[in-house]
Design a protein with these regions (language model features):
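Globin-like tetrapyrrole-binding proteins
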Residues: 1-147
Length: 147
């Protein structure tokens, strides 16, 4: 990621971070409108998840220069998401919902920012998908061994 992209992402995040609950609410609204079947994977009370959403975005923004520090945690998170019912195709739906929520929350949205967020969120999704795949493969091996 270029220094210019990082600067744009940080500026964008600081703009929307002033109202974090609004951004999280928009994200979940966008997500469930785009994929109503995903609503069943979430608790009725979304309050705690909104906090997780905000914290996760802030963590990513802090580590944009070196996303490798997050790889192990993201892989573990991907494995957890398998247990919660997430499927590989859900990741693109989530990415697009985050981008729509950010766009709706930003007064300074443009094509460069859209591309920057797309790259950043994809960089998060890839290790999560890798972790999900490993988790599934280990489960399959255990099943084959009769566990």
């Amino acid at each position: 990621m270029t220094p210019e992209s990082i600067a744009r992402l940080r500026s964008s995040f600081s703009e929307v971070a002033a109202q974090p609950r609004v951004l999280a609410g928009r994200f979940y609204k966008e997500l469930f409108e785009a994929a109503p079947h995903l609503r069943a994977l979430f608790p009725a009370d979304m309050t705690s998840l909104q906090g997780h959403f905000e914290a996760a975005l802030a963590l990513v923004i802090r580590n944009l220069e070196d996303m490798t520090v997050l790889q192990d945690s993201l892989r573990d998170l991907g494995a957890q998401h398998v247990g919660w019912g997430a499927k590989p195709g859900d990741y693109a739906i989530v990415r697009d919902a985050i981008i729509r929520a950010l766009r709706a929350s930003s007064a300074n949205w443009n094509d460069d920012l859209q591309a920057d967020w797309h790259r950043a969120i994809t960089a998060i999704a890839i290790p999560m998908l890798q972790g999900a795949a490993v988790h599934t493969a280990v489960f399959a091996e255990r099943m084959a061994e009769g566990e």
